[in-house]
Amino acid sequence: MKFSKPKFSMPKWRLTKEDFTPKGMWRNFKNFIVIEAKPGTTLAERFLTNEDLYPVPKSQRVWGPWNYVAFWLADSVNVNTWMIAGTAVESGLSWWEAWITVWVGYTIAAFILTIAGRAGAVYHISFPVLSRSSFGIWGSLWPILNRAVMACVWYGVQAWIGGECVTLMIRSIWPSFSHIPNTMAKSGTETYQWVGFFIFWLISNVAIWFPVYQIRHLFTAKSFLAPPAAIAFLIWALVKAHGAGDAIHAKTQLSTWNHGWAVTAGIISCLDNFATLIVNNPDFTRFATTPNAPIFPQLITIPMGFGITTLIGVLVGSASKSIYGENIWNPLDLLKSFLDHSNHHGVRAGVFFISTGLCLAQLGVNIAANTVSAGNDTSALCPMFINIRRGGYIASIIGICMCPWNLLSSSNSFANSLSAYAVFLSSFAGILIADYFVIRKGYLKVDALYTINPNEPYWFTYGINLRAFASYICGLLINVVGLAGAVGDKVPKAALTMNNIAYLLGIVTSFLSHLIICKIFPVTACGEKFLDERPEETDNYLLTLESTEDTISSYEETEGIPVKKVSYDSKEKSDDGKSGGIDIKESSVF
């Protein structure tokens, strides 16, 4: 099954006078915004499916183990990860204790992420489609909506951070750039900062255009450029400070009780950092060449890559105190200080190189964690009108409209709110993992995930699995008081203490609750033993998509409306020379 490369093509009509009437213009507009559907798809099914939601065809399963190594190695280098260990040091831990907590945290995160993405690698389906098996055909819209909202918010935040990288790049070339007149004072930002943000936003829009299975090349490029930039930053800071500074020699002064909770908070912060990636990991594992391709790259590369990045962050932050008298954990703030204190061409060249690497790092993180997720999620919310590409651009527009500089101006409350929101995502993750691994034992009826039929196993109660929502509420209730405290309300101290492990409480509680509820009220379509071989469900379902018409590649008039159709050809072969099933020839759509 082979998709052709996407192209931008406008429907070609022979214009008549009627096309310029209100009725004609409305008809043409509707034809443009409606996503093409497989011939024979009913109107009801069009609210469940489009080409981006179907299982990935064989020709697009091109992510091998080394692609996942490059992906996670590239993703590990970003501004947020850089500062995690520094935050733990600020809480009172020694540098090596902070680093160990990071290794432990990301090892746990890698394990949870790997099992959460298993269904995507086996059945080649995305998170929104997988959610239908647990929450029901219509019930899945709730976790999808939650994930989509988070993706849009985080897109704007990460884009603003990427814009700061662009600003540093421009400042290193034209030092006077930061002194241009501020015409945006009332908006809460500086003109030069907004220009950097807008440039990064435009660059991101170019990356959004490409289909997901092709953007692996972006992460490969990032894996070769971003880590060397981080290492160069480390060497530069150590040389400039004549060592790593005093922070690495400091010992913890915390009591045993506070020391234990500081370690715990450091571990959980890593899980919070991965909350979104854990849930939407099937969006990437679905492109795996084999079900096992992502396993070891994720289990090994994530703790190693993220651990090394945080180590660099701690050493650079410690060195900054010897240079400027204070620990500067944010790498962008330290680069700004370099430019503020020196106009030497060597300093400017170094800042430009490092800022370019960090800019590429932020671009990759934003595409992986937010754009792809928002595209998949919004596509599932309204598949008749939105595909992954359009969904990505929707997130991009929301990201700039939400004025992320205003959110970050009150950084503490905003960061606490986003961290608290990880509780919602942890409950979703616990249910998805319990449902797939324990209850269904790895078996999914793929065709039923795309069907509105009361007789199918994922219809449950009018399309909603009440068991999953009961489990979801259990996962929230155990954290609801601590959640209120995290956003500023007065709550008992015990609740605040529990909030330090909110993610683990949420995922474990929802996991166990779902097992118990489904034991009392069993679901159908479950395996008798765990599926330990590659199922034929996905490929068999793809074969059923073959139309009775062998080739449909042009616009045809249906009741006077031009309708775009998709052609199917079962004779194409995949890249490895084996039969690739159906060939969907996409005359693609924006």
UniProtKB/Swiss-Prot annotation:
Presence of the UniProt keyword Cytoplasm in the record: yes
The UniProt record lists the keyword Lyase: no
Compartments, record wording: Cytoplasm; Nucleus; Membrane
Keyword entries, A-Z: Cytoplasm, Membrane, Nucleus, Transmembrane, Transmembrane helix
Lipid bilayer topology: Multi-pass membrane protein
CDD domains recorded: SLC-NCS1sbd_NRT1-like
Gene3D superfamilies membership: Hydantoin permease
Region (Disordered): 566-590
Primary subcellular site in the record, as a coarse category: cytoplasm
GO molecular function, one term: nucleobase transmembrane transporter activity
Transmembrane segments: 69-89, 95-115, 125-145, 150-170, 195-215, 219-239, 259-279, 299-319, 391-411, 419-439, 468-488, 501-521
Residue intervals annotated with topology Extracellular: 90-94, 146-149, 216-218, 280-298, 412-418, 489-500
Pfam families: Transp_cyt_pur
GO cellular component assignments: cytoplasm; nucleus; plasma membrane
One Gene Ontology biological process: nucleobase transport
InterPro entries in the record: NCS1 (IPR012681), Pur-cyt_permease (IPR001248), Uracil/uridine/allantoin_perm (IPR045225)
Ranges of the Cytoplasmic topological domain: 1-68, 116-124, 171-194, 240-258, 320-390, 440-467, 522-590
Family: Belongs to the purine-cytosine permease (2.A.39) family.
Protein name (Swiss-Prot/TrEMBL): Uncharacterized permease C29B12.14c
Organism: Schizosaccharomyces pombe (strain 972 / ATCC 24843) (Fission yeast)
